């Protein structure tokens, strides 16, 4: 089911646009579909046919996604394992201070070497209402004021569904445009389409290295944009929407944590409308990568910040409960057979 399908379903029951808007807003807030106001109860506002049909619509919406399990962490975050209608699993993460990270694909075709999700390949796309349903489930647990599309999957490979979800959340969902964050490895289609949208989200770009060859090794199936081209495209979007680009950099000890790389960041980002997010690597079973020491991370932040690049450390939420993206799902689906979608269909 997509957004237009939901509106058509309600229209078939006799709902006018005003009724549809109120019903959809109630769902997006995690409330009952017939939730109205103290001054105007449902029986005074919704047509009889709509009221009679809402229980079935509610059941259909509940069937889009359900909470399989919740895993609270010591840092105030909570990782949600969400089961979709076909029993596929995705992860979303409730973050401190009202944030939520949602998944846009089951699996991923980019194959980043430091990401658990990429190990499974792409299994299927997540529909727009399946993304929104992750927000609904989260809002039933705590307030959600910011949604980042940084969970499982590459949003640019599911662009229509992601943009539809962003539009719905940025209008009826009541989330400010700057508080909707589209994360991508840098697909050119993103830079073409985002400026044309009614809801223009903030943008996070996966950089990870200023050396083109190393970046290709770390993100083997990312579009062939050089780091310089990626930053130029990001800067153009930032100036158009008037909020900075977030550049993502997973810190891997001995690989991309050298001062030479930090100087490369200064060369690319100094004077740009940008924030550099350094993300200490979250280890996975059976890999050879490690995060730098805490002292080294502090040194790198100070090095960049003191030379004119706003730099923050973004630790993976819930590190004590399989905090890296895709790790919780991998543990839950261990031993089950899964069919991958070839990368060319991504």
Curated annotation (Swiss-Prot):
Protein's GO biological process: rRNA base methylation; tRNA methylation
Domain Radical SAM core intervals: 94-320
Any one GO cellular component localisation term in the record: cytoplasm
Family: Belongs to the radical SAM superfamily. RlmN family.
Active site: 91, 325
PANTHER family: 23S RRNA METHYLTRANSFERASE, RADICAL SAM CORE DOMAIN-CONTAINING PROTEIN
Protein keywords: 4Fe-4S, Cytoplasm, Disulfide bond, Iron, Iron-sulfur, Metal-binding, Methyltransferase, S-adenosyl-L-methionine, Transferase
GO molecular function, one term: 4 iron, 4 sulfur cluster binding
Protein name: Probable RNA methyltransferase PA14_40730
Main subcellular location: cytoplasm
CDD domains: Radical_SAM (cd01335)
Residues the record lists as binding [4Fe-4S] cluster: 108, 112, 115
InterPro entries per record: Aldolase_TIM (IPR013785), Methyltransferase_A (IPR040072), rRNA_lsu_MTrfase_RlmN/Cfr (IPR004383), rSAM (IPR007197)
Species the sequence originates in: Pseudomonas aeruginosa (strain UCBPP-PA14)
Cofactor note: Binds 1 [4Fe-4S] cluster. The cluster is coordinated with 3 cysteines and an exchangeable S-adenosyl-L-methionine.
EC number: 2.1.1.-
Entry keyword Kinase: no
Cysteines joined through disulfide linkages: 101-325
Cofactor(s) this protein cannot do without: [4Fe-4S] cluster
Compartment(s): Cytoplasm
Keyword 4Fe-4S carried by entry: yes
Residues annotated to bind S-adenosyl-L-methionine: 153-154, 183, 206-208, 282
């Amino acid at each position: 089911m997509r957004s237009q399908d939901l509106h058509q379903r309600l229209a078939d029951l006799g709902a006018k646009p005003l009724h549809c808007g109120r019903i959809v807003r109630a769902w997006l807030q995690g409330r009952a579909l017939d939730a109205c106001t103290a001054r105007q109860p449902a029986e005074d506002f919704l047509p009889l046919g709509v009221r009679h049909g809402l229980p079935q619509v509610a059941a259909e919406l509940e069937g889009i996604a359900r909470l399989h399990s919740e895993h609270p962490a010591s840092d105030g975050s909570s990782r949600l394992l969400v089961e979709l209608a076909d029993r596929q699993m995705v992860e979303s993460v409730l973050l401190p201070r009202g944030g939520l990270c949602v998944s846009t694909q089951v699996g991923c075709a980019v194959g980043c070497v430091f990401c658990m999700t990429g190990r499974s390949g792409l299994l299927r796309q997540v529909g727009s209402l399946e993304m929104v349903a992750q927000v609904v489930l989260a809002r039933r647990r705590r307030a959600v004021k910011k949604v980042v599309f940084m969970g499982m999957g590459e949003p640019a490979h599911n662009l229509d569904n992601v943009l539809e979800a962003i539009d719905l959340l940025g209008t009826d969902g009541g989330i400010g445009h700057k508080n909707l964050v589209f994360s991508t490895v840098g697909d050119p289609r993103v830079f073409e389409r985002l400026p044309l949208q009614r809801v223009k989200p903030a943008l996070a770009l996966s950089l990870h290295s200023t050396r083109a060859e190393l970046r290709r090794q770390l993100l083997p199936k990312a579009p062939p944009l050089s780091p310089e081209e990626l930053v130029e495209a990001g800067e153009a979007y930032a100036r158009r929407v008037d909020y900075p680009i977030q550049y993502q950099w997973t810190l891997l000890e001995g690989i991309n944590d050298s001062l030479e790389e930090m100087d490369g960041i200064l060369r690319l980002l100094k004077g740009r409308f940008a924030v550099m997010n350094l993300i200490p690597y979250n280890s996975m079973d059976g890999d050879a990568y490690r995060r730098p020491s805490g002292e080294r991370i502090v040194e790198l932040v100070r090095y960049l910040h003191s030379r004119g690049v706003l730099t923050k450390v973004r630790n993976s939420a819930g590190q004590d409960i399989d905090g890296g993206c895709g790790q919780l799902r991998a543990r839950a689906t261990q031993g089950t057979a899964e069919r991958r979608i070839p990368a060319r269909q991504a």
